[in-house]
Every structure is written in C-alpha cells, then in structure tokens.
Amino acid sequence: MESTPSRGLNRVHLQCRNLQEFLGGLSPGVLDRLYGHPATCLAVFRELPSLAKNWVMRMLFLEQPLPQAAVALWVKKEFSKAQEESTGLLSGLRIWHTQLLPGGLQGLILNPIFRQNLRIALLGGGKAWSDDTSQLGPDKHARDVPSLDKYAEERWEVVLHFMVGSPSAAVSQDLAQLLSQAGLMKSTEPGEPPCITSAGFQFLLLDTPAQLWYFMLQYLQTAQSRGMDLVEILSFLFQLSFSTLGKDYSVEGMSDSLLNFLQHLREFGLVFQRKRKSRRYYPTRLAINLSSGVSGAGGTVHQPGFIVVETNYRLYAYTESELQIALIALFSEMLYRFPNMVVAQVTRESVQQAIASGITAQQIIHFLRTRAHPVMLKQTPVLPPTITDQIRLWELERDRLRFTEGVLYNQFLSQVDFELLLAHARELGVLVFENSAKRLMVVTPAGHSDVKRFWKRQKHSS
C-alpha cells in the first residue's frame, strides 16, 4: 500500500501493494541476494499465479534454456492475457531471463540462484533456517498457542490505540517516528503528541493482516536509512512465515541488526520474547500469516455491526472495544458511557475537527455504514440521508474558501494606468484577483517582481 494525494487538503488514499509489486521495485542486485535464501524463494513461489508456478516447476530441473516459442506453446491462445501477465511477472522478479540459443533463437532459463534455492526449499537439504533450541533445554516459561494469540492481539492493539490518541497507550520512539514517516500520524505543534491523519483513519479501517503488511512495507522502505540490511530482515520475515506456531526458536547466530529488528517485531506483536535478553523467541500467528496474507491485503474489517445512528444525530455504539470507542470519538462528542454501550452526538464542531485532521466526510460515512447494527441494515438506505448529507455539507462548509497568497496593487491615479497594469498581469498569467470599480488587483508573489518592474518602466517613460 502507498499513500497518494487526492482531491482536497490533506486527503490521501491508501493503495495496496502486494508482495510481487514490492519485490518488483527492488534492484536486481537486492533480488539476487534475496534469492540466496531458500525461505525467500519458497515464499515468492507460493505467491505466484498458477500459470507462473506451472512454468517454474516445468523448468526447475532444466540446466539449459528452452526456446521462447516452445514455452509459448504450453498455453492455449484463449489464455494469452494470463500468459502475458505471468511472463511479465517472472521477468520483473528476475525468476527467469532470456538467453540467446545457438542459431540466434531467443530462449528462457530460470535464474540459477532462484532455481538452486527453490530446489533446496522443496526437496530439503542445505543449512537449517534457524538454530536449534535443544542446547538451551526446555523452556520453563513456554507459551501455548492461545497465549501467543492473546499476546499478539494485545501488542498490536497498543499500536492502534496510540494512533487514536488513547492516553494509556505508549510506544517506543522508533515506532512513533515510523508512524509519522508512513503518513499515518502527524505532529501539529512542536512538543504536542502526534494525531491521526486521513491515511491513518483509512489504515484503521483495514483488517489486521492488511494493516500489518502495509506497516511492514513502510518499515522495510526506511530500513536502509536506519543502517539495517534489507535483504537480511526480509529473509528473516520470510523465514518466520514458515515457522511452527507454538514452537520456540533460538537467537544464536543473529547479528546485532537482526536482534534489533527482533525487538521491533516484539513490539508489533509478531514475536514473543519474555525478556529483551532472552535467548529464545516464539513467532506469533501474525508473523506466520504475514506473507501468505499479502494478496488479500487491503480489505476492510468484517465484523458484526454495532452502531445505531438516529436522525437527531445521536449515535449508539453497542461495544466494549476501547479501540472502536476511540475511533467514534474522533468525529463525535461522547455523552454517556455504559458497561456495554456508549452514546455520542455527531456535531458540526466534532466533524469539522475530524476534517481538520485530514479525515474526510466519506470516510466517516463509510465507517458508520460498515459498522451499522443489524437493525439498521434492514432499512434502505442504511444511514439516514439527513445524517450523510449534513456530514458532507459540514465538509463543504470548511472547504468553501481557498486561500491564495498574493501582493496587492491599489491607489492608481487613473483608470488607464490600472487597466494597463491589469492587462500586463493577465498576460503573464499572474493575476489572482481584480476589482475595476475600486481600481485594485492582486498578483501572485512569484509574478510581483515582473509586474513591479513593468510598472516602473511605464512611470519613467511617461
């Protein structure tokens, strides 16, 4: 996923990038180094389309290139589009490349590094992907699968609570900085805690696997600037995805950079490590599902609805989730809180405050609609039109004025002088505003020097 500008101030839309798109943007040298790890090759192979997988398996044990024409005959003409997509994908990921055959024909051959390590991953052999923990003995504080799932959920929820401004949620400085670099949060004033952005609000609407994938993409994009080896940490992530849930792994042999990365994964909830200096760790379900869930990244949360909205702008949320309550508080005023329900009021001030932070009216409406209580789903439309229309109007009300910097010219001695300078500013394309009756005009700061120079020449010549 990437944040891309949209219409209006501070409006962005999250775009999802899957594993193939991310790897396709890496340099050939980085890709070849990545393919030096069997876990990476297997993870990439697993995410390929079925046609591309078929080609790779048919060529996996061939040491000589095949003619391109022969490979093309493997696919029927009606599947030419899928053939074109798979061909481009395998070339873009450097899984295969062209090679000139005797006689001048073009041939195709698998990348030898990828071929060798995919064989190892599929058939066994090579070095162990992780160090054995048998030398450490049995873990006195072993974790079972339910406790790992609970730990991962709690750790990730701390990150989400921090994004919505929950005072009880605290994260490391590295994580807070990463959230800002990713465009999910921003600092309004020096010394003030960061607040959520439009992109951050969209981020919270995604399901957990999509959130984690987007977040890890941002982490990887800034890894090298933090002095980390991108290939090393990517290979470790792929290695984690093939781990066994509930099994412990040793940190022996890890570099300092990788140990630091492990602490970040610990904060995200991807691994459990009892203490920072503990010699073993447990991958959680979030880490194991990370790369396999990439292709589905970008979906919104699918959960039972719990919000009822009335035409009087009252909002009733039947939930105990602190995160959902904090999300509702971003665009409404909290009135009452009960053990399993909160009551809030959607007001002009609360909506415009949310819009000032970069949250759009459409995002608020989408949030309410996707979390609507089953009772509301029975009516058409789901949300009262008076509510949706008013939220959009409050947004338009805030956006109706556009501020443009400029330089004012007034106090002209004659209408002729005014029209002469006005025509010159219009010709240069720097005119912002004019009022002929009052003989005043405004030009852009960039065009001010040219207009001023022209006016001085006219005064001297007259």
UniProtKB/Swiss-Prot annotation:
Q: Which InterPro entries does the protein's record reference?
A: Tfb2_C, TFIIH_p52/Tfb2
At the top level, the lineage of the source is Eukaryota
**Principal location class:** nucleus
Name the UniProt key words of this record, in alphabetical order: DNA damage, DNA repair, Nucleus, Transcription, Transcription regulation
GO biological process per UniProt? DNA repair; nucleotide-excision repair; transcription by RNA polymerase II
Location comes to: Nucleus
One function term, GO molecular function aspect: RNA polymerase II general transcription initiation factor activity
Q: What does this protein do?
A: Component of the general transcription and DNA repair factor IIH (TFIIH) core complex, which is involved in general and transcription-coupled nucleotide excision repair (NER) of damaged DNA and, when complexed to CAK, in RNA transcription by RNA polymerase II. In NER, TFIIH acts by opening DNA around the lesion to allow the excision of the damaged oligonucleotide and its replacement by a new DNA fragment. In transcription, TFIIH has an essential role in transcription initiation.
PANTHER family listed in its UniProt record? GENERAL TRANSCRIPTION FACTOR IIH SUBUNIT 4, TFIIH, POLYPEPTIDE 4
Oligomeric state and interaction partners are given as: Component of the 7-subunit TFIIH core complex composed of XPB/ERCC3, XPD/ERCC2, GTF2H1, GTF2H2, GTF2H3, GTF2H4 and GTF2H5, which is active in NER. The core complex associates with the 3-subunit CDK-activating kinase (CAK) module composed of CCNH/cyclin H, CDK7 and MNAT1 to form the 10-subunit holoenzyme (holo-TFIIH) active in transcription.
The domain comment in this protein's record states: The C-terminus (residues 305-462) stimulates the ATPase activity of XPB/ERCC3.
What family is reported? Answer: Belongs to the TFB2 family.
Q: What is this protein called?
A: General transcription factor IIH subunit 4
Question: Which species is this record about?
Answer: Homo sapiens (Human)
Species classification: Eukaryota, Metazoa, Chordata, Craniata, Vertebrata
In the UniProt record, the gene name given for this protein reads GTF2H4
